[in-house]
A protein has these predicted regions:
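Helix-biased detector of long, well-ordered alpha-helical tracts
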Residues: 1-222
Length: 222
């Protein structure tokens, strides 16, 4: 909380078999500095600031099958605030922004597409993935939330036949403390990636797709 510049104002405790920690966050923002999930423009690229696969790795942890590297990388990703990425993104023109959490990359990309009146294309070959996450998906270590996300959203998604089932599970995988999905001009996205690296950003960010005029489906995964 100190890193985020927040103040803890109160709370309550519970007794449970495993540790839980949650917060309700309130704050203030200038109206001219709000980033919304609507506003993506045809021709934009999509920048994702964290690797995917937290839900898959956590499911493997619960099954006692996760590698030490996978656990370490998942904890590092979940523990990393979006603060540095946000500060770097402030230096360019952001057209839309959302965090990728419980609805997975596909679900939050769909929210952006619907709010913006455009279609988004996710290129699975460009996705950064936590170690062993796809292996766990291939073993069936898939969180229940993934199936709910698919059931709710697949009607608005065109999934190319070449996309393997494990990759499909990955894009619908619910994330805990996921990264930012941002639409912006390509040159701005490339500048952001350079600045993140120079600033010592510990995670892998990258361009994962692009925005087109509205097509038959809001989201295309290929």
């Amino acid at each position: 909380m100190k890193e985020a510049g927040a103040v803890l104002a109160g709370g309550h405790s519970i007794n449970d078999e495993e540790p839980k920690y949650g917060l309700c966050v309130t704050g203030f923002v200038h109206p001219d500095r709000i980033w919304k999930n609507g506003g993506a423009q045809a021709g934009d690229v999509l920048l994702l600031t964290k690797p995917l696969g937290v839900g898959l790795v956590n499911t493997a942890v619960k099954a006692g099958m996760a590698s030490e590297e996978a656990k370490r990388c998942a904890v590092e990703s979940m523990s990393c605030l979006n603060k540095l990425a946000m500060e770097v993104l402030r230096e360019v023109e952001v057209h839309s922004c959302t965090d990728v959490t419980g609805f997975g990359l596909a679900g939050h990309a769909l929210e952006t597409a619907r709010a913006s009146g455009v279609s988004l294309v996710i290129e699975t070959g460009r996705l950064e993935v936590l170690p062993d996450a796809l292996f766990y998906a291939s073993m069936g270590l898939v969180p229940e939330g993934t199936y709910r996300n698919k059931a709710y959203n697949k009607k608005d998604v065109r999934l190319e036949d070449k996309v393997e089932e494990a990759l499909e599970d990955l894009v619908f995988d619910p994330q805990t403390s996921g990264g930012l999905l941002v639409s912006l001009r390509r040159e701005d996205a490339e500048a952001v990636l350079v600045k993140l690296e120079k600033a010592g950003y510990p995670l892998k960010a990258g361009i994962v797709g692009f925005v087109t005029d509205l097509q038959e489906k809001f989201l295309m995964i290929r």
